[in-house]
């Protein structure tokens, strides 16, 4: 072979080998990048979210949205005016104390000092956070760790399980069970814990139990005796209690809200969560707080100072002023804490009546602004929608499409083992204007007409 031809062949082979090496290296780089771009294990399997799924579906303005728990009634004018006034003060548009703006924590110590019947240190026993979510997250990150177990009562607010898992702990679930066999007149009080079952969930690994009262989504207010039973187990097993009480002021006639932290032996082991959004109907402000003993709160403060650091100053100033205004009116008709509950009680009763007229079975809540309803009696055939989702998910999607009415499936608030118990229930929100409830009533009245 001519030397020139041989050189050409050798050159071609070299180019081919070089190209293959580059491709192989590029492939290795891609695989390495894929591994490094993978999610952290602590969020594995936590990407599904009922709010993301149903908020977009219900975004059509023609749909009457009773799904998400936000008010479409106006907040108190003095709270909005307080924000406008705060924004006009230059220093209140800058950073404030990271653990809570002085005006707000002092106001909280006054209001809750009266509620707890104890003096609260505004700077050591209260932490202001970004909503109730921030309070719960700070609590989990500060006090729960890998290998711990946290007891969660079903149905639960959906962020509890992901937050426990992100802390490296194991959620241990126990359901409320319906004790009444009646098909009408069911109350949230008819949903109870089996005390033997509850006791069986506590062991040496149990770090905490989460109590939500009034409960979202059922609206159950845990009675003093029910809370005492939980407290006894906490004390026996040296367990913490995380008490989510964001609906604490929305208590309807004939019922009493008891703070588990006020029971003997519970203050030193309880973190109580509160919310400005729920207190003053300003959910978009995203302000919440944790109240508890100094030896626990300081750990939450550590999380706060190394994550979010602080909350918006003018919002905190406005909420603080609002709390002080209503503190002076506590026990009087003009106090917003109690006035809102009176307003919502009528809306609750109206919603229960119109759901019952349609053939559904409402569970009338003792507190909060949600109502779950059993849709079993409607006998809606949804077999055409497949069997890859629980019945309530399919029912809500069908109802949004066919009836233009949005709700939330209750199995979004339970674990896999309790799906069958809750899949015929949907959750509706009634902190809505009369015009919104009018539109919902029109849909329900015409339910069987097409």
From Swiss-Prot:
Pathway in which this enzyme or protein is active: Amino-acid degradation; L-kynurenine degradation; kynurenate from L-kynurenine: step 1/2
Cofactor(s) essential for the protein: pyridoxal 5'-phosphate
Residues holding substrate: 69, 216, 427
Modified residues (N6-(pyridoxal phosphate)lysine): 278
EC number: 2.6.1.7, 4.4.1.13, 2.6.1.63
Annotated keywords: Aminotransferase, Lyase, Pyridoxal phosphate, Transferase
GO cellular component, one term: mitochondrion
GO MF terms held by the record: cysteine-S-conjugate beta-lyase activity; kynurenine-glyoxylate transaminase activity; kynurenine-oxoglutarate transaminase activity; pyridoxal phosphate binding
GO terms (BP aspect): amino acid metabolic process; biosynthetic process; kynurenine metabolic process; L-kynurenine catabolic process
A matching Pfam family: Aminotran_1_2
InterPro entries membership: Aminotransferase_I/II_large, Kynurenine-oxoglutarate_AT, PyrdxlP-dep_Trfase, PyrdxlP-dep_Trfase_major, PyrdxlP-dep_Trfase_small
This protein's record includes keyword S-adenosyl-L-methionine: no
CDD domains, sorted: AAT_like
Similarity annotation: Belongs to the class-I pyridoxal-phosphate-dependent aminotransferase family.
Protein role: Catalyzes the irreversible transamination of the L-tryptophan metabolite L-kynurenine to form kynurenic acid (KA), an intermediate in the tryptophan catabolic pathway which is also a broad spectrum antagonist of the three ionotropic excitatory amino acid receptors among others. May catalyze the beta-elimination of S-conjugates and Se-conjugates of L-(seleno)cysteine, resulting in the cleavage of the C-S or C-Se bond.
The protein's name in its UniProt record: Kynurenine--oxoglutarate transaminase 3
Organism expressing this protein natively: Danio rerio (Zebrafish)
Name of the encoding gene: kyat3
């Amino acid at each position: 072979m001519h030397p020139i031809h041989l050189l050409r062949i050798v050159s071609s082979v070299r180019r081919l080998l070089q190209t293959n090496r580059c491709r192989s290296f590029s492939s290795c780089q891609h695989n390495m990048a894929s591994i490094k771009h993978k999610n952290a294990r602590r969020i594995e399997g936590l990407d599904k979210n009922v709010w993301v799924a149903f908020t977009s579906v219900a975004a059509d303005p023609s749909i009457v949205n009773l799904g998400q728990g936000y008010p479409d009634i106006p907040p108190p004018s003095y709270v909005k005016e307080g924000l406008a006034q705060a924004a006009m003060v230059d220093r209140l548009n800058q950073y404030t104390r990271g653990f809570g703006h002085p005006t707000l924590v002092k106001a909280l110590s006054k209001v809750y000092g009266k509620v707890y019947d104890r003096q609260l240190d505004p700077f050591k026993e209260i932490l202001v956070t970004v909503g109730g979510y921030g309070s719960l997250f700070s609590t989990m990150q500060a006090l729960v760790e890998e290998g711990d177990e946290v007891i969660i009562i079903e149905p639960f607010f959906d962020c509890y399980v992901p937050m426990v898992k992100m802390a490296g702990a194991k959620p241990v679930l126990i359901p409320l069970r319906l004790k009444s066999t009646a098909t009408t007149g069911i109350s949230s009080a008819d949903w109870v814990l089996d005390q033997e079952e509850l006791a069986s969930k506590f062991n040496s690994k149990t770090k905490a139990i989460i109590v939500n009262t009034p409960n979202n989504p059922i609206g159950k207010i845990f009675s003093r005796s029910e809370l005492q039973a939980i407290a006894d187990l906490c004390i026996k097993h040296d367990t913490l209690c995380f008490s989510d009480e964001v609906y604490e002021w929305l208590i309807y006639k004939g019922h009493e809200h008891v703070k588990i932290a006020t029971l003997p032996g519970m203050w030193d082991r309880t973190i109580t969560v509160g919310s400005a959004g729920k207190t003053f109907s300003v959910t978009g402000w995203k302000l919440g707080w944790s109240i508890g003993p100094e030896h626990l709160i300081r750990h939450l403060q550590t999380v706060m100072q190394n994550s979010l650091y602080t909350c918006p100053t003018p919002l905190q100033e406005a909420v603080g002023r609002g709390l002080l205004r209503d503190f002076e009116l506590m026990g009087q008709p003009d106090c917003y804490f109690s006035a809102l509950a009176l307003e919502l009680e009528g809306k609750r009763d109206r919603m229960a009546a119109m759901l019952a007229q349609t053939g559904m079975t409402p569970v009338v809540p003792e507190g909060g602004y949600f109502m779950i309803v059993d849709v079993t009696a409607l006998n809606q055939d949804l077999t055409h929608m497949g069997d890859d989702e629980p019945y309530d998910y399919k029912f809500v999607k069908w109802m949004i499409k066919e009836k233009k009415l949005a709700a939330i499936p209750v199995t979004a608030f339970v674990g896999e083992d309790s799906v069958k118990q809750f899949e015929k229930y949907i959750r509706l929100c009634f902190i809505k204007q009369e015009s919104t409830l009018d539109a919902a009533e029109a849909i329900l009245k015409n339910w069987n007409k097409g």
